[in-house]
Amino acid sequence: MKLSIIIIATSLVIAVVAFPSKDSKAIENDKTEQRMEIVVQETARACSKQIGDKCKRNCECCGKTVVCGTIYVGGKEVNQCMDKTSDNAILNGLGKGMNFMENTFSFCV
């Protein structure tokens, strides 16, 4: 009986020490006290760009196998709608299949 009382008392002391009150001053960089504002931006849900147009997301590009891909022009990264992945017909066919799967999981309306 005394052992169970000691265990309960110890548990209560640990709980009081572990959970500080809300009145205590928050420490700078304390993640539990920081608040974050989340801004939801409207994103494109339907296609509006053709192959070769600049894009930001797959949803902007029209076509089942067209994705927003990255190319490098003069050392700078440029995103544009594209469907060709290779000069080899077999690899290009596989690439279009992968583009189709990528568009399937983009959840564009």
Curated annotation (Swiss-Prot):
Q: What is this protein called?
A: Hainantoxin-XVIII-7
Q: What does this protein do?
A: Putative ion channel inhibitor.
The propeptide segment or segments lie at: 19-46
Q: What disulfide bonds does the UniProt entry report for this chain?
A: 47-62, 55-68, 59-108, 61-81
Signal sequence span is 1-18
Annotated compartments = Secreted
Record the organism.
Cyriopagopus hainanus
Q: Which domain of life is it from?
A: Eukaryota
Any one cellular-component term (Gene Ontology): extracellular region
MF annotations from Gene Ontology: ion channel regulator activity; toxin activity
Tissues in which the protein is found: Expressed by the venom gland.
Q: Write out the entry's keywords from A to Z.
A: Disulfide bond, Ion channel impairing toxin, Knottin, Secreted, Signal, Toxin
Main localization, broad class: secreted
Q: What is known of its domains?
A: The presence of a 'disulfide through disulfide knot' structurally defines this protein as a knottin.
This protein's record includes keyword tRNA-binding: no
UniProt record similarity statement = Belongs to the neurotoxin 25 family. F7 subfamily.
